[in-house]
Amino acid sequence: MMEVKAIHRGARISAQKTRLVADQIRGLPVDKALNVLTFSPKKAAGIVKKVVLSAIANAEHNEGADIDELKITSIYIDKAASLKRFTARAKGRGNRIEKQSCHITVTVGN
């Protein structure tokens, strides 16, 4: 059984939001998964779609796989480093803002 990975490290979107999209396509054949991602209104769908397309290209180029038989065997989202920022508040105070990022790992196989 062949499995091929594609990883996007440091995607500038929170892991929580990205997992909502990842849960929808886990275990689907790649053509159905791409269809779901194409018509999803979420920002994370576009990012995950690029990683899925990269995994498909890796399978085709490196392993000579047939695209019609591929399915998403695993997809997981890990939390990555946060960018710490401050925003001004009233009376000279400041609040910390964390700009979240995540690592997206997609594995396709047959």
UniProtKB/Swiss-Prot annotation:
Gene3D superfamilies: Ribosomal protein L22/L17 (3.90.470.10). GO terms for molecular function: rRNA binding; structural constituent of ribosome. The keyword RNA-binding applies. One of its GO terms (cellular component) is cytosolic large ribosomal subunit. The keyword RNA-binding applies. InterPro entries: Ribosomal_uL22 (IPR001063), Ribosomal_uL22_bac/chlpt-type (IPR005727), Ribosomal_uL22_bac/org-type (IPR047867), Ribosomal_uL22_CS (IPR018260), Ribosomal_uL22_sf (IPR036394). One of its GO terms (biological process) is translation. It comes from the Bacteria. Keywords: Ribonucleoprotein, Ribosomal protein, RNA-binding, rRNA-binding. This protein binds specifically to 23S rRNA; its binding is stimulated by other ribosomal proteins, e.g. L4, L17, and L20. It is important during the early stages of 50S assembly. It makes multiple contacts with different domains of the 23S rRNA in the assembled 50S subunit and ribosome. Part of the 50S ribosomal subunit. NCBIfam families: rplV_bact. Belongs to the universal ribosomal protein uL22 family. This is Large ribosomal subunit protein uL22. It comes from Paraburkholderia phytofirmans (strain DSM 17436 / LMG 22146 / PsJN). The lineage of its organism: Bacteria, Pseudomonadati, Pseudomonadota, Betaproteobacteria, Burkholderiales.
